[in-house]
Amino acid sequence: MTREISIEDFQSAEECADCHLQHYQEWETSFHAHAFSDNIFLNMWNDEKESRPTTGVNFCIQCHAPAAFVSGYDLDGVDHPDEFNLPKAITEGVSCDICHTMVNKSPSVHTQDHVAAVAKYHINPGEGIKYGSIQNPDTNSFHESAYLPLFNLSSSCLPCHNQS
């Protein structure tokens, strides 16, 4: 990724529902949709921020609010997303654009006791292309669609799902 990513580069999952209603409805009830709003996560995140003030904020949001992580959005001082007027790209947790703007497989460092893991994303939101596992996708007027073979591999989920 050579350009800086802005939080405004990410589309809300609600926009995707216009054409992909079934996928949106499946996502809406998933852990991904609630990755940043689940009370168990929020309690653990707040504990982590207290015990590790220098790494606690970013350590958790890299996977639970990846749009905030890659855009550098400052979540310092945020204890609960409902108490702040945060962009939907953050409150939606792991939404469509996080995965469907991935342009390359994204490995991640495994967590060790003395090192905070850093998720590595190779994404390009805002460019207007959505990637997926369908070869020769239909054209549409909303965004360009492209096939990437990495979407057929579970290893495309490695930025976050890296624990053995």
Description of each model-found segment:
Residues 1-92, 97-152, 158-162:
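Sequence context of c-type cytochrome heme-c attachment sites
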